[in-house]
Amino acid sequence: MSSFSRAPQQWATFARMWYLLDGKMQPPGKLAVIASNKLQGLNKPVYHQLSDCGDHVVIINTRHIAFSGNKWEQKVYSSHTGYPGGFRQVTAAQLHRKDPVAIVKLAIYGMLPKNLHRRTMMQRLHLFPDEDIPEDILKNLVEELPQPRRVPKRLDEYTQEEIEAFPRVWTPPDDFRM
């Protein structure tokens, strides 16, 4: 193979790709795993811990993330101002109302390695609460990553034919009153 034909392959290996990830109805931890792998460049053959070869990740719909169970009220985020009596705690619901991208940002920040590259990797993360993406970012996008979990269908999204075709466990008699 000549060096002329290897040049595009090498360029594609070292180039910074832009990935789109939809956060609608997805748990923040699952989004963080996918995003941290792309931000670190773990998917590239030239990956090394000391090299900065990660890609850009754009996450949309962070306002519509989903927690399982009662985590909106039970999960607590803590911080300290550094002053006496400056310990602060907020639940996930309070933090999400205040800043819709903060929960996903903190989840990804916690997944990245604790070294000097961490803040550089976070600069390549672009979070948006809705589907509105600036035009300059939109033109750079290369690939849309699959969602980690299948999004369930809401009850009002089913057609009447699908409802009638659904198998019934029990059919009430005509004179049955509720």
From Swiss-Prot:
Modified residues (N-acetylserine): 2
Pfam families linked: Ribosomal_L13
Keyword Membrane assigned: no
Compartments reported by the entry: Mitochondrion
Gene3D superfamilies registered for this protein in UniProt: Ribosomal protein L13 (3.90.1180.10)
Assembly and binders: Component of the mitochondrial ribosome large subunit (39S) which comprises a 16S rRNA and about 50 distinct proteins. Interacts with OXA1L.
NCBIfam families the record matches: rplM_bact
Protein name as it appears in the record: Large ribosomal subunit protein uL13m
Organism: Mus musculus
